[in-house]
Amino acid sequence: MSDPELAGQVALVTGGGRGIGAGIARELAQAGMRVAVAARSREQIDKVASEIGGIAVEADVSDRDAVSRMVSDVERELGPVDVLVNDAGIAGGSDAKPMWEEDPAAWWHVFEVNLLGTYLCCRAVLPAMVERRSGRIVNVGSGGAYLPPRPGMVGGTAYGPSKAALYRFGELLASQLAGRGVAVFTISPGLVRTEMTAPLGADAPWTPPELAPRLVRVLAGGRADALAGRYIHAEHDDIEDLIARAEEIREQDLNAIRLRR
């Protein structure tokens, strides 16, 4: 069923060819949005776009020129981006190797995709959003940013830090956008079983895959704009309760990930 506040709006979902990103693309299409699905794998995004009646845009989010072309293509075919979902990400390995045996170039590439890619995508859509005084950005984080290490955890020493930086980036960006009509959120989807996380095994505490897409749908609709800049967990946070407590959350500085003394 479509949502009146979202019907006809344009969403761009990076990393939308599979896993969590594909689920978000499907959810936003069901809400009535016109969805652009972006990723490096043409076959994957073509499949999802065909399924939801959207468009597929092949792009490497770590490449500034590619991101500019991606946004231009979406604007030409669908119109200005109303909602950007930054889900594109890579793990870059496992914890099998100690840090001193990791390839520095591969380690840094995780940051180029997970953090720089998010930065470049935000940078590409924000001028138009700020000019219109309307827009929403949802950055998809990970429990790898703050959970204790565990056997089989993906990404070696790169993935978790890249996602931790993403939370802080979202908080700072939201502060810069305050009063400009654009809301930025960072979510944790929980431990969703995907190709990236499958090595954790059947006994891992898996999160239902539909929770993150449902949360993104609520955030995209605007009712949670008072929570801009906050960290929201798809499984452990009740978004309706958070919306009702938005003033308290702001006043008491809740739902923020920070190092504490």
Task: Walk through the language-model features, giving the residues of each.
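The beta1-alpha1 cofactor-binding region of Rossmann-like NAD(H)/NADP(H)-dependent oxidoreductases
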Residues: 59-70, 104
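A short, exposed helix-loop element centered on a Lys and neighboring polar residues
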Residues: 122-123, 171
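Substrate-binding pocket helix/loop in short-chain dehydrogenase/reductase
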Residues: 95-99, 103-108
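Catalytic loop of short-chain dehydrogenase/reductase
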Residues: 91, 104, 138-165, 170-171, ...
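Conserved glycine-rich Rossmann-like NAD(P)H-binding loop of the short-chain dehydrogenase/reductase
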Residues: 31-47
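C-terminal helical subdomain
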Residues: 179, 186, 202-261
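Conserved glycine-rich cofactor-binding loop
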Residues: 17-18
